[in-house]
Amino acid sequence: MPLRLDVKRKLLARSDRVKCVDLHPVETWLLAALYNGNVHIWNYETQTLVKSFEVCDVPVRAAKFVPRKSWVVTGSDDMHIRVFNYNTLERVHQFEAHSDYLRSLVVHPTLPYVISSSDDMLVKMWDWDNKWAMKQSFEGHTHYVMQIAINPKDNNTFATASLDKTVKVWQFGSNVPNFTLEGHEKGVNCVDYYHGGEKPYIISGADDHLVKIWDYQNKTCVQTLDGHAQNVSSVCFHPELPLIITGSEDSTVRLWHANTYRLETTLNYGLERVWCIQAQKGANTIAIGYDEGSVTLKLGREEPAVSMDSSGKILWAKHSEIQQANLKTISTEESEAIQDGERLPLSVKDLGSSEIYPQTLAHSSNGRFVVACGDGEYIVYTAMALRNKDFGQGLEFVWAVDPNMFAVRESATNVKIKKNFKDHKSIRSDMVLEGISGGPLLALRSNNSLCFFDWESAVLVRRIEITSKSIYWSDNGEMVAICGDDSFYVLKYSAEAVANATEVTEDGIEDAFEVIGEQAEAVKTGFWIGDCFIFTTALNRINYYVGGEIVTIAHVDRPLYLLGYMAKESRVYAVDKDLNVISYKLLLSVLEYQTAVMRRDFDTADKVLTTIPKEQRTRVAHFLEKQGFKKQALAVSQDPDHKFDLSVALGDLKTAYDLALQSDSEEKWKALSNAATLKSELLLAGECLGRARDFGGLMLLATCAGSAPLLQKLADDSAAAESHNISFLSSLLLGDIDACLDKLISTGRLPEAAFLARTHAPSRVSSILELWKAKASGHSEKSSRKIGESLADPVKYENLFPGFTQSLKAESFVREISKIPVPASVRVPSAATRNIQEELDEAVASGAVSFTDDGQAVLKNAPRQTETQLKAPPPPSVARQPSPVRQPSPIREPSPIREPEPEEEEEQEEFDDDQQEVHVPANQESADAHGTSKTPDVVLETSRPDIVPPRGSAAPDLVSASSQQSAQDFQDDTQWSDEDFGDAENGDLNMDDLNLDEED
């Protein structure tokens, strides 16, 4: 029967004449040596030119990859061998290798050797580890040596093809050939070895239009392939498939069956003469070089023929050889030590050879039989001894749940059902079948519909209008996955509805299937474990589907094909195209728990949870989180990071705080501060911001709360952390100009310090100016111009700074009035709206202030802040206070003061008598009448608690020491409301109205 292979073109790259092609064993690269002297590297998956080398000005007839060295080796008509690094594109080495054109290059698979042949009739071997010294020369041909091929089964021997009409076989270390194969009537252009172990064959192609296959042990020609109309320029045994590939100057590439020598396919891409063919080991990819470009093809499918039964016995086919491996040979200790994705150390046993080339292997449900299907035939073997049980013609073979029943697709429209290896039923379809699938029902697939038939009666159960590629049934026969090109459907099968059906339409029984869900995933291979569907995707992921959710088991770097699941080991087993068996941990208890949760059977879920190991519970917690059960996920999760995220999402700030303390991560503290702010937990938010060293957030919190102690602490901490901008701004908000100047000086910002002092602290201008001059002079020592000398000191050059003396007095005046205590109930305008000089003039005129000989202001009869009050920095502006000094104009009168107790009344009157009458501006009444303000309240922080503790310390003392006056003005229990800040007016911040608790 013919070998049925799909041929898919991956790349067609037009170029100058291609004399040699090669395929990279790892990358998806095609190497093409051109007649114009260039070498191109194409990515045949993306169809893009990756790299290009300008080798020489004459034809490059040979080029090969050396992957272990990242090299490309070329041979050209200038008799030189050149070596390039294909990553850097640099030329590593070049030397003259022959005295005539180079025809062929091969790279030894294990040794550091490159072998070249030439028109000088010589074959030479070069050692790149020994500075490319010639290791050996082989002489014996009497004409051009066209090609070399190393024996893949014995790397010490190689064959050469020559225009002297012979093929010679050589051995390293000997200068004479082992033997010569003669039979072609004209020059031999190409030669290759058979890669399988069962046939000692060599293939050759010649100018006599013939292809000959030789037995190099018997030294005889076993077959001649006649079909080409011109010279045969290239031949190849495919290393994976039972194919012989030949190319000719008649523009065709012919595919022959390697066992029957039957011509399978002829390819012609219209690119003129064929010059070279290369097949990739371990894959189904071939490359072809033509006169007008190069082509890359993919033959058949790369999925290996492999099957595993329920006991862990694995059978696979390598070419026509059947081999067996058993998972039970791995000890318990070895199994526990195996990591996910690690190759299993299995011992392989040869069972024998199949009469056909198996493209698929499949065990029966009880594992007793295994079927090999391929070449249009099937053979049923016993799984233990590989004895032939049944055979026949068939394009496809599937098993029923009953191990004694199976179905064979004999043609595109006919399916035969056999029972006990005897004909049972036959189904003649009115549609063109693309495939069949087994299971509880027999499924027939066409390009636009899917039909399910009963095995016993061959009666249609249900027709579904859907395009499907594969069908997977659960073990209990209730669930089925119908997989298409880019999605799959999960259906529930009701055997009871089918048995009790009273009406059968032309589309079968309507209630036979119920759609459970659809998922946009391209399934490559899959199987069921209970109600969980395990599958691999086109994106090389291993996932499982349970209850409408997809969970990823692993991401892999290559395509994997699932074999099955072993409950005892709790592992999913898969194989790659090179037949390496790997596994991944997947606990059955986890699947049972997730299934129970999806069914909302929480009692069962709680029972199963106790059987799940702790190291697997975090995966369960992620599943619960996706399902919306965050509280349960928090209780189950073992990952501190995951628990922190869940506690923040749930608003459980206490748990989140404890977890953040354990890790002490800035990211966690920032996240917790955001959550605490949303919950109006400002104390906690402040502590978190402090631990996270988020000085910007602390400043926002301190200014919103009006906390002077917090601002002072923030200024100190940020300065220690060298966050100078925050420290400067904090001191500026506190009105501590001296601290601001010190920060500017310490950071070398002397010009800025001088200008700030000129505006706010004239008394410090001279000292800062001296520092500025010294720094400027130091920078200009090598210059003829002294920059520092151009800076004028206002003290020495008062004529250049009119009013400087008055500004000194104003500064002293402001420093004195800032010491007057300010009630929290008074609202005052900002400093920008005040005229300090005017206030000073009025105070001097009224005699409320006088100046000493050194210019220091002295206030008369003005109360002073106590020692406790002086610990807090002064406010940026002064509030109204009974004093002979003219106070800044308030926006409104203070809130009504609580009536004093009788025993305090006399003392209060005595205090009032000692004070002068307060000057109230005329515009105050109108402002009070409207009750509006353009500036925020300024609150003297006396009893406000420090919100943020020092970094790394224990929880803060939430109530700071208060003075006697503070105790009278505020209640002992501080509340975040307008009662602390005076009456609420338009523009006031009413924290009770924020309702932050509802924002989460």
From Swiss-Prot:
Where the WD repeats fall, as residue ranges, is: 13-52, 55-94, 97-136, 140-180, 183-224, 227-266, 351-391
Q: Which InterPro entries match?
A: Beta-prop_COPA/B_2nd (IPR006692), Coatomer_complex_subunit (IPR050844), COPB2 (IPR016453), G-protein_beta_WD-40_rep (IPR020472), TPR_COPA_B (IPR056176), WD40/YVTN_repeat-like_dom_sf (IPR015943), WD40_repeat_dom_sf (IPR036322), WD40_rpt (IPR001680)
Main location per the UniProt record: cytoplasm
MF annotations from Gene Ontology: structural molecule activity
Matching entries from SUPFAM superfamilies are given as: WD40 repeat-like
Q: What happens when the gene is disrupted?
A: Embryonic death and abnormal oocytes.
Low complexity composition-biased segments: 960-969
Segments for region (Disordered): 863-1000
Please report the record's description of how this protein sits within the membrane.
Peripheral membrane protein
Supply the Gene3D superfamilies for this chain. 1.25.40.470, YVTN repeat-like/Quinoprotein amine dehydrogenase
Q: Which UniProt keywords apply?
A: Cytoplasm, Cytoplasmic vesicle, ER-Golgi transport, Golgi apparatus, Membrane, Protein transport, Repeat, Transport, WD repeat
Q: List the disulfide bonds.
A: none
Against Pfam families, the record matches this protein to:
B-prop_COPA_B_2nd (PF04053), TPR_COPA_B (PF23953), WD40 (PF00400)
- What do we know about how this protein assembles, alone or with others? Oligomeric complex that consists of at least the alpha, beta, beta', gamma, delta, epsilon and zeta subunits.
**Family, similarity comment:** Belongs to the WD repeat COPB2 family.
Q: In UniProt terms, what function does this protein have? A: The coatomer is a cytosolic protein complex that binds to dilysine motifs and reversibly associates with Golgi non-clathrin-coated vesicles, which further mediate biosynthetic protein transport from the ER, via the Golgi up to the trans Golgi network. Coatomer complex is required for budding from Golgi membranes, and is essential for the retrograde Golgi-to-ER transport of dilysine-tagged proteins.
Question: Under what name is this protein listed?
Answer: Probable coatomer subunit beta'
Name the source organism: Caenorhabditis elegans
